[in-house]
């Protein structure tokens, strides 16, 4: 019998990014990764890996001017990356709106006056400018396929955001409400003060991005605690009892809410509350229990981790418990001297076999085709990873480098 690979949880983080050479600003590179904190040093030659087209010393160092984050799968990020790299070949940029915003593309779509047949497209030139890439990004985010995805554009360079803003003010079509723009990095001096949560707040620089499941700890802990004893729980929509072992159950992420629902019940309720009849998956909705707005992707990320990686989910909670105890002990120790014999037991215990390392979610990432030999040596001396959560960064052979 054919064995099927067990489905993996939704990745904690995946993004597409636009690199720019700090030496020559006209040199640009588009890529994708589950870990931009690690990826940027690779492009700059500080760590092994990176891409062949960013390996020239005369163009280093590179900077990440912006990231498009919020992808719920590696496949989705790769689709977006390819379309951004090859706008002239992407079916997502063939809509009438996109043709209106690109006069040359609109002219190419006209029929030949003599034969009546559509004119053949001339061989596309490489799109070289920063403005061109931002135009394509804007069009992709407005496209039918990507406009309902929970994506965020995070700008780290103020001059790049100014170019984006100039184009955004010129184009007639606006970004969907689902797409968020976050001012970060150099933009913080002029960015409005914000206390946004769920990854919408500025972080200052690439190294401060939250790329693991830490932000899901409280939600995951509450869900697993409640669903371990579901006898008194019922669906907030249909009011029937729930059975976590047999049904897909979602839990409201808000801290003080105990709302639990059948997956299909809540998705139907959220979809019925919208005016978009073509929408198959909800983007957000109002929790029937607490009345707060809930992002659908937040619940799906927690549900997939709880159902598809229960062992690892419990290890995450053990790590949180140990961290909290250690922090509490440190706070007590700062005011009252403590001997080693009075340390909490959890601090003296050796980690269990099930405990996860700090980078467990990325242990199987493949960085680049330029580091195949190094990876093979590394794998020969390291035990296999316990869970393949995300896979490799993208490094297309024909990835676009603009010079």
Curated annotation (Swiss-Prot):
One of its GO terms (molecular function) is zinc ion binding. It is found in: Nucleus. GO terms for biological process: double-strand break repair via homologous recombination. One of its GO terms (cellular component) is Slx1-Slx4 complex. Its cofactor is a divalent metal cation. Residues 362-371, 390-403 have a biased composition (Acidic residues). Its main location: nucleus. It holds the Pfam family GIY-YIG. Residues 116-126 have a biased composition (Basic residues). The keyword Kinase does not apply. Keywords: DNA damage, DNA recombination, DNA repair, Endonuclease, Hydrolase, Metal-binding, Nuclease, Nucleus, Zinc, Zinc-finger. Its EC number is 3.1.-.-. Residues 12-94 form the GIY-YIG domain. Residues 91-126, 321-403 are annotated as: Disordered. The keyword Hydrolase applies. A zinc finger (SLX1-type) spans 235-290. Forms a heterodimer with slx4. Catalytic subunit of the slx1-slx4 structure-specific endonuclease that resolves DNA secondary structures generated during DNA repair and recombination. Has endonuclease activity towards branched DNA substrates, introducing single-strand cuts in duplex DNA close to junctions with ss-DNA. Belongs to the SLX1 family. PANTHER family: STRUCTURE-SPECIFIC ENDONUCLEASE SUBUNIT SLX1 (PTHR20208:SF10). This is Structure-specific endonuclease subunit slx1.
